Amino acid sequence: YIYSADADEVLDEENREKFRYLKENLMPEVEIVQMYYGNQLSHRSVYNYDRELRPKLFKRQRSFQWIDPIHETVRLLPVVFDSDIEITHMPQGSHAGRDLAIFEDMVKREESFSKRLFTMYAKELLIAGDREKLACAEDFFTQAADGGQTAPEQMKEALCVVVRAARLRGDDLKMYRYAMKGVTDEGISEVCWELGEYYFMQKDYVEASIWYYNAAYETSSILNIHTGGDLPLMRLSECYEALGEKEQAKEYRSLAKSWT
């Protein structure tokens, strides 16, 4: 088996013992072992959850096996074992600047992005990217949003980045044009959040509250989970506070603080 390690991860004594036991008792048919990765939210990382399973141990050689008694085919999905081993992520600083610089170099060299890397780039921008980094990435994601070959999920992710970048630049027309693409069908929390932010900054608290409500209750987030949870709930509290509706403001403030 091959263990995939990061330079900033730590395995304490208890989990080293669990790992030793796992290696001694691992069944040969297991091809991937997943382990919990903890402390992910430190330093504003790209992740939405502080603890989640990740594939960490991989079988070196994997042979195909025939399955099903009729219409036989080979099994394509690996045999995965979810262990209770927990690795602690202990970065000494934020990696966002480094990661975004690598993505920017890939764009300059016109390298292709896998769906996974495309999603990671969009996540890094929405969770940790500043105004400058968003402006740098705007053309790349605009092309993706306009591209006829872009997969539906990546299209939605591109819209989230373009809408935020355009809003921060003050390009209201572009922001609104791409936002409307993102609120059709089921809608996207990130886009509703950006529209709420636009109207909030204009001090149009009634209109802003509509979009914050949509972000929190009518849509789902795809990149930053907080845009569908505590962020719009807290903004709803601020909107109702500005409108003089104290009880509503108090209720949403409580919901925001208790959101997990």
Description of each model-found segment:
Residues 128-131, 169, 202, 243:
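Structural motif corresponding to the intra-repeat A-B loop/turn of tetratricopeptide repeats
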Residues 107-114, 144-155, 219-226:
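Flexible helix-coil transition and linker loops at the boundaries of alpha-helical arrays
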Residues 142-146, 183-184, 215-220, 257-258:
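Amphipathic alpha-helical segments of tetratricopeptide repeats
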Residues 11-132, 136, 141:
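Catalytic-site signature of metal-activated, phosphate-bearing donor transferases
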Residues 1-13:
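Short beta-strand-to-loop acidic/aromatic patch adjacent to the donor-nucleotide binding site
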